[in-house]
Amino acid sequence: MGRGLDYSILLEGSLKLKEISYIHSEAYASGELKHGTIALITEDTPVVAVVTQSKLQLKEFSNIKEVQSRGAGVILFMKETFELDKEAAWESVFQLPAMEDSFMVMPASAALQLLAYYVSLDKGLDVDKPRNLAKVVTVE
């Protein structure tokens, strides 16, 4: 879950998780949380949250508290300069190197790709040969 640029980052991260670990994953815009998405949250729901945009961090942390209150385990990727609620129950927290908001796409995207990579390795999958994927562009 994320807002603005973070949502775009999550779309890519979700795709990578599907492609190489074969786990169903959906990216959700945090602002849409109360329009149906919240109904899917249970104690067994892992939630990946990305918070890198300075102007949106307070709203995003508020949305994260909502999913935590429903028992979801949250894996948080956040800009290292943001203040973390240490009393909240986090599954994992990954602090990303701080830079201009518009450039946070780079470390956040790489972090989500690494998440997909290590989940795949943990499942014993060959990340270099994902099944049923074909190159879109071929060179003759």
Give names to the regions the model predicted.
Residues 1-140:
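A SIS-like phosphosugar-recognition module
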